[in-house]
Amino acid sequence: MRVEFTKYQGLGNDFILIDNRHQAQPCLTPDQAVQMCDRNFGIGGDGVIFALPPEGDTDYTMRIYNSDGSEPEMCGNGIRCLARFLAHLEGKPLQTDITYRIHTLAGTITPSLQADGLVKVDMGPPFLVPQEIPTTLGEGTDPVVNQPLEVAGQSWPVTCVSMGNPHCITFVDDLEAIDFQTLGPQFEHHPVFPQRINTEFIQVIRPDYLKMLVWERGAGPTLACGTGACAVLVAGVLTGKSQSQATIELPGGPLQIRWAGEGQSVFMTGPAEKVFTGIYETG
C-alpha cells in the first residue's frame, strides 16, 4: 500500500502526518507505524499522527501511534504539528489566524495558528487527583506534590500531573549530573504508575526559566514534549519553584507555558514546521 505523508517537527520532536479524513480509523496498524518511525529503515519519527473525521462538535479527530506502536492519549508538540498540517490540507496560507477544535483521547484540545507562525494551544486544565493520573502515590484526592519515590536506590521528590497523559516531574540541582538513560526507563516502568509514565527532570534557572529533560512513555528520550512542558509549569507552581508563566527550555528549544491556577487551562505556545512530503510503501 502506498501512503502519502508529510513530516513535521516541533522543536525537534518529529512526526509523520497522514491525511486520514476519509475514514474514522487509522489507515495503518501500530506495527506499520513502528516501521515508518524507524530512523534507519523507515522515514524516521517519534510518532505517526492521523488526521481523522470529527466527533461531536469538533473540527477533526487526532490519533497518534508512538514509535514503539503504543497509543498515547494526545501529544502537545504533535497537536501543534497537526494544526499546521490541517491548515495546509485546507489550503490556508502559512501566516494565518485560525483555531481548530480537535477531538483526542484526552478530550477536546484547541490549537490556534498565529500570524507570527507560532501555534498557541489551550491544553485544558491539568488533572491532579492521583487516580486520574493514574498513580498509586498519595491518598484520596490530594495532589501528589514533592512525594518521595524510590528509584535506582535513591529517593526522588516527585510531583505528578496529567495533561490527559501522565507525567512525573522531579526537580534537580544539575541536569548534567543525571544518569538520564538509566533513570528514564526505571521511572517509566515503576509499579506506582499502572499505565507507565512520562518523566521530566527539571533544573530551575530562574522562576520564569526552567530547563527540562524528558523521557517519554513509549518513545524514550526526545528533543521536546509539549504536554511535559505544561505539566512542568504546573508542578513548578504547585511546589513554589516557578511563576505562573515561564519559558521551558527543552533540548530542541523553548516553549512558552502559562497557567493561572487550579481549575484553569494551561496554555502552550511554540513552533511547528513542515520538513518534507513523500510516499511510503508499506510492507
From Swiss-Prot:
Keywords noted in UniProt: Amino-acid biosynthesis, Cytoplasm, Isomerase, Lysine biosynthesis
UniProt-annotated catalytic positions: 75 (proton donor), 225 (proton acceptor)
Domain of life (superkingdom): Bacteria
Catalytically driven reaction(s): (2S,6S)-2,6-diaminopimelate = meso-2,6-diaminopimelate
InterPro entries cross-referenced by the UniProt entry: DAP_epimerase_AS (IPR018510), DAP_epimerase_DapF (IPR001653)
Annotated site residues (Could be important to modulate the pK values of the two catalytic cysteine residues) in this chain: 167, 216
Single GO MF descriptor: diaminopimelate epimerase activity
GO BP, sorted A to Z: lysine biosynthetic process via diaminopimelate
Binding site for substrate: 13, 66, 76-77, 165, 198, 216-217, 226-227
Pfam families: DAP_epimerase (PF01678)
Pathway: Amino-acid biosynthesis; L-lysine biosynthesis via DAP pathway; DL-2,6-diaminopimelate from LL-2,6-diaminopimelate: step 1/1
Primary localization class, coarse: cytoplasm
Xref: NCBIfam families: DapF
PANTHER family named among the record's database cross-references: DIAMINOPIMELATE EPIMERASE, DIAMINOPIMELATE EPIMERASE, CHLOROPLASTIC
Subunit structure, as described in the record: Homodimer.
Protein name: Diaminopimelate epimerase
GN (gene name): dapF
